[in-house]
């Protein structure tokens, strides 16, 4: 069985995962600049948690290629990020990109623009503000796309598709 990583965990690592961060903090087992590579063997990881970290990535494409390298076939990647049309996306001055529900479709094609990734989007969940969260999904979709700050963040589950 492979590793379960929490990359960019800070001091709040998910239980049962190996903490990976740029800084040495409580719960962090591996200190590295994960945008410069990940110190794990090819195909050695079964699950990766990326909670509130992708908006900070200078080079998301290279990071996703590196992530794909270390994932075993079928590995799950759990992304949580501020929704691009939310206040939370703009409050943090260290955010360098804004993530939409379509961002990870870019990594969903093998050799798309020469990428070395094939992550399939398995699910997407949107955390809506009140009163929007009590509305039917059809209305939530419209409000999150066309109304500023209706959606706070989103969770995306990806799966690494590789030959076995």
Question: Which sequence ranges carry the predicted segments?
Answer:
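Conserved SAM-binding loop
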Residues: 2-85
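Short, Lys/Arg-enriched, disordered terminal segments
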Residues: 1-2, 164
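S-adenosyl-L-methionine-dependent methyltransferase catalytic module, highlighting the catalytic core
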Residues: 58-66, 72, 76-164
């Amino acid at each position: 069985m492979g590793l379960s990583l929490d990359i960019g965990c800070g001091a709040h690592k998910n239980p049962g995962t190996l903490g990976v961060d740029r800084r040495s903090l409580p719960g962090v087992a591996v200190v590295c600049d994960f945008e410069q590579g990940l110190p794990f063997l090819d195909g050695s990881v079964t699950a990766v948690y990326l909670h509130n970290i992708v908006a900070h990535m200078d080079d998301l494409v290279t990071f996703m290629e590196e992530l794909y390298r270390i994932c075993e076939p079928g590995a799950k990647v759990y992304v949580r990020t501020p929704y691009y049309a939310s206040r939370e996306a703009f409050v943090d001055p260290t955010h360098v990109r804004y993530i939409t529900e379509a961002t990870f479709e870019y990594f969903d094609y093998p050799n798309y623009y020469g990428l070395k990734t094939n992550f399939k989007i398995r699910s997407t969940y949107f955390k809506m503000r009140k009163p929007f969260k009590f509305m039917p999904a059809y209305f939530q979709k419209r409000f999150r796309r066309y109304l500023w700050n209706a959606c706070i963040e989103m969770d995306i589950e990806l799966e690494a598709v590789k030959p076995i």
